[in-house]
Regions:
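C-terminal motif of bacterial Sec signal peptides marking the signal peptidase cleavage site
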Residues: 15-19
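Bacterial signal peptide processing site
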Residues: 21-23
Length: 179
């Protein structure tokens, strides 16, 4: 759970400093979509099959800072096989980018020696992008839990559970659709 908390730490810092807003998306009758007002529920998706979810979360990080959060979740039989998280912060303010870059690098450092957990921070002149790829199908779950802690995480019986991730993501205002 520490990883998930860490992933959202930067967003929370940003929200605390600058406020946070959500764009209300109209409801859809298409299976596999949901809106922020409704929240994500695992029953919206075919957990018993194999599939991919494309998810996004919008955040307002203050004047001159744009934050885009997106996730690609591959799953089979209710278990997450792979999770790709992309967090991109765009700003012309160097000090804001420094704050995000340092936070992302600090988070990523905790996982440096964990095989099948890849965290990459890329900085350019007006953005910082933090991409995390976790192969839950191959990662050593015990080592992952040593880093993250066993309390309040998405792992149950040694597997990363889609329903638990969807519950957590839904609380953060994440919107998903099957792809």
């Amino acid at each position: 759970m520490k990883k998930l908390i860490s992933l959202f730490l930067v967003l929370i810092i940003c929200c605390f400093m600058c406020g946070c807003g959500k764009e209300e998306i109209p409801s859809s009758d298409v299976t596999g979509t949901t809106n922020i007002k409704q929240g994500i529920v695992s029953e919206d998706f075919n957990e018993k099959g194999t599939g991919k979810l494309k998810c996004s979360q919008e955040a307002v990080a203050g004047e001159g800072i744009d934050v885009d959060l997106s996730y690609l979740v591959s799953y089979k039989n209710g278990n997450i096989l792979e999770l790709v998280s992309i967090q991109k912060v765009v700003s012309s303010d160097k000090s804001s980018l420094d704050l995000y870059e340092n936070a992302y690098r600090g988070i990523s450092k905790n996982y440096d020696n964990l095989k099948y957990y890849d965290g990459v921070v890329v900085r350019d002149s007006n953005s910082v992008t933090y991409t995390i790829t976790i192969n839950y199908d191959k990662i050593d779950i015990k080592k992952l839990l040593e880093i993250e802690g066993e309390e309040d995480n998405i792992v149950k019986n040694g597997k990363a559970k889609l329903s638990l991730w969807l519950d957590l993501a839904g609380k953060m205002g994440t919107v998903c659709e099957e792809v």
